[in-house]
Amino acid sequence: SPRHMFAHAFKSRGGWYISLRQDHQLKRDRSRMNAPAKTDDFEAPKPAIIPDNVYAETVLAVEHYTEHLFRFRMTRPAGFRFRSGEFAMIGLMVGDKPIYRAYSIASPAWDEELEFFSIKVPDGPLTSHLQKIKPGDIVLMRKKPTGTLVLDALTPGKRLYMFSTGTGIAPFASLIRDPETYEKFEEVILTHTCREVAELKYGFDLMEEIREHEFLGEMVGDKLKHYPTVTREEYPFQGRITDLMESGKLYTDLGLPPLDPAVDRGMICGSTAMLKDTKALLEKAGLTEGANNKPAEFVIERAFVG
């Protein structure tokens, strides 16, 4: 049966990519993304001059969440490999030169398309242009992904905390949709802190997509907990994540014990201040920062802030 095939396939690392891709092709539902069903529908002309050694990919779908946030999906180059949680340098031709910025890949490694979640900066060198993209437009991407928010950079544990603010949720959007995350951890907690309630919607959309996915929904089950908080509006869960960690409210709300380096692992992505403060709290709890070449109890992405 297809379910048996899937369960069997992802035992081997390459196998479940194939099974998930096949399922993704069959089950992909684009109704909420206002996008066409096929990549082939676009025969967009490539820009006249594309820099050497970069990919030129076609935008497939764009969804604007607020006046500050949007997500988009684009074609994935044949042969482009990455680990869930990594980032890529993406860009646009502005005038006659390319402008690039680091963006976490929000889609999981098995997805046949690439997804990104972006802030809109009115005078940003790249985002002032990127926020105007439409299906059929061309986005550039450098060929080598990288990043520290990968499962390989953590030592084995029981529970994985993903601490995010703003667009810092993007690498975790990739990881919470990757079966390997649930092979390695019994529990996964995604915290997402924003200023306003409307900015949390991407996280809620991700939860719904996982629940509705034929295979991921069954595999994830109740292993994944979502903890959204806001700092500027009334909401059931309010406050900076570091304040909620320090007071213990985070753990009380989740029904979990405080951080324990024997079982808990962490990943952090967000604003500069949030990275610094969350790192300090994890270290105070006895967790040690790791890296790709030296796995430990938690990792931080410092390549950009969101």
Model-assigned labels for residue ranges:
Residues 5-9:
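Short hydrophobic alpha-helical segments enriched in small aliphatic residues
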Residues 35-44, 49-55, 191, 196-306:
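Reductase modules of NAD(P)H-dependent flavoproteins
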Residues 36-137:
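Ferredoxin-reductase
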Residues 96-103, 146-154:
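Short, Lys/Arg- and Gly-enriched loop/turn segments at beta-strand edges
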Residues 139-147, 244-248:
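Helix-loop module immediately N-terminal to the HCX5R catalytic loop
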Residues 165-171:
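Ser/Thr-glycine-rich phosphate-binding loops at phosphate-binding pockets of nucleotides
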Residues 171-180:
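Histidine-anchored nucleotide/phosphate-binding helix
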